[in-house]
C-alpha cells in the first residue's frame, strides 16, 4: 500500500526533497493512516513531518480524548505536534455560519499560521477515494458542471496535498488495524443527519449492492477524466483571455467580441474576470454569469449588482466588471439639490450618472388632478416642495425609514430581512435621502414623510436606470 501512495505522490508531484510537510490530524482513521505512512516514508522521501490538531470543543470529553490521542501518537512517532483549542460554537454564532464552515475556516487559518511561522512547504489533508466518490455524488445532485465533477484535487495551490486520495476507506481501516494504530472514531460520522453521511451510509452501499459494486473506483475515474478535460478548456481560456479582456483601473473590461465566442469559453472567461476582480472563488453562480451575458444586450449605462460588492456595467456593448469600494461609495454624496435647483426649475429635468450608485433621471412637474403614478418599483414620485436637499448613498449603521402607511420608523436591516434581500446585496442597494432622511430604498420601500398627498402641488419623479427591472 505504501508503494501505491508513493507512486501517487510522484505522479502528482506532491512532494520534493527537503519539504516540510504538515499533516492535518483529527485523530480519525484517515488522518492517522496518512500521518503513519508519511512517518514511515520520511527517509525515503527526504522530508520532515509535522502534525496539527484543532480541538473544536464541540464534543466534550470525546474531543479531549481525541486531543490526548493525537499527542500520544505523535510522541510515539517522534513527530512535533501543534494543538489548538477553538470554541467553534461561539465563532459560528458570532459569524452567523454553520459549525462545519466555522470549523473548516479555523482549521485552515491555523494551518496557515503554522506554515508561515515554521516555513512549512506542504499541508497534507487526509481525503480518500470514498470522500472523492461522495463529493461527486453530492455535486451531481446539486447540478454541477464539469468543473464540479473534477471533485477533490490531489494538489491545490501547490501547497495542499492529498497523498491518500488513491486509497479506499476499507484499505485505510485495514492499515490502521494491521499497525495497531487504534484511531479515534467521531460518532457524528455515524449519524444520518448530514447529507454526506446519508450518501456514505445509505446511497453508496445501495448502489454497490444493486448497480455497481465498484462505484467508488468508477467515480474516481470519472473525476480523473473530467480533470483532464477541464485542464484543456482552462488552457484555452488562458490563451484567449488576454485577447478578449482588458485589465484597467482595478476592473476588467470584457470586449464585445468575447460574446461571440462559444458559450463554454465565454462563461469561463466571465468567471475568470469575476474571480480576478473579487479574489473570491466560491460565491459566483451560473445565474450571475447568465445575468452578465444578458446585460450585454441591455444598452449602454445599464448596471447590475453581482455579489461580494462586484458590479457589471455595460459600456457601449463592452462589459466592465469591477469591485465597488463600499466605504468610499458610502461617503460619496452624489447629488445635492441646492446645486441643481435652478436647472430643475428651468428645465424640469436632470440626469445623474454615477458608475457606483447608478444612473438617475429627475423630473419636476405640476401634479395633475387624478394623476396615476407608475407601479414600476424603479420609478417613484414624491412631494417636491417638502424637499430641500437630496443625497444618494449606500446604507450606514443605524439607518431607518418611516415606511409608507406607518407612523414609526423601522431599521433598514429589518426591512431587508422582511423583503428577503440576500445579505451580500444589502450594502449595495442605493438609498435616496431627502433632508438627510431616507425617502426611498431603491427598488423597494418609500417613506411616509415625502409621499404625494392632495395638498401636493409639484412632484419630483425619480427614475433609477442603473438596475434592471
Curated annotation (Swiss-Prot):
Keyword Cytoplasm appears in the UniProt entry: yes
EC top class named in words: ligase
Residues annotated for ATP binding in this entry: 26-31
Domain of life: Bacteria
Cross-referenced CDD domains: TilS_N
Pfam families, per the entry: ATP_bind_3, TilS_C
Keyword entries, A-Z: ATP-binding, Cytoplasm, Ligase, Nucleotide-binding, tRNA processing
Upper taxonomic lineage: Bacteria, Bacillati, Bacillota, Clostridia, Eubacteriales
UniProt cross-references to InterPro entries, sorted A to Z: Lysidine-tRNA-synth_C, Rossmann-like_a/b/a_fold, TilS/TtcA_N, tRNA_Ile_lys_synt, tRNA_Ile_lys_synt_N
EC number(s) reported in the record: 6.3.4.19
Swiss-Prot/TrEMBL domain comment: The N-terminal region contains the highly conserved SGGXDS motif, predicted to be a P-loop motif involved in ATP binding.
Protein purpose: Ligates lysine onto the cytidine present at position 34 of the AUA codon-specific tRNA(Ile) that contains the anticodon CAU, in an ATP-dependent manner. Cytidine is converted to lysidine, thus changing the amino acid specificity of the tRNA from methionine to isoleucine.
Family: Belongs to the tRNA(Ile)-lysidine synthase family.
Cell compartment(s), UniProt: Cytoplasm
A biological process from GO: tRNA modification
GO cellular component, one term: cytoplasm
A GO molecular-function annotation: ATP binding
SMART domains: TilS_C
Name this protein carries in UniProt: tRNA(Ile)-lysidine synthase
Primary localization class, coarse: cytoplasm
Catalytic activity: cytidine(34) in tRNA(Ile2) + L-lysine + ATP = lysidine(34) in tRNA(Ile2) + AMP + diphosphate + H(+)
